[in-house]
Amino acid sequence: MDDIISRTVAELERTGRFSEMKRFRQHGRYSVYDHCVNVAREALRIADRVGGKLDREALVRGALLHDYFLYDWHEPEPNRPNHAFHHARMAWENARRDYDLSPTEEDIIRHHMFPVVPIPPKTPEGWIVSAADKACALKETLSRNAPNKDTEQQEDTP
């Protein structure tokens, strides 16, 4: 794991419920935790290619928290709204409750589902994480039966 990602993961695990994301499946055998680490890694790769003045700390932190909704979206619940349209808001609410977020981190979390949700990101970091999220979701979904080799997590994801 990149140093900035490792450092940020350690801080989020120490100060909030970040580790709980390991319990929830995201795409195939990938946990939400694995997915968020993959998105942070891909966002850094995109940022390196794009260049320019970017807040790399906010980029990584927002990427790691973009799916901080903390529930199993594969299990239907009658009172829970449609996951695709509402999980970004739930992730943002949980992240605000557990962490102090910068405006850039809030933008990343709230708008990563563009264009499914029609409000686009306002920051370059938000656009990068939105793109990284879609790239990782596609890769994870298409390799859904493959064990996760992209993160250091050793436990088998349900």
Task: Give the residues covered by each predicted segment.
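Metal-dependent phosphohydrolase cores
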Residues: 1-158
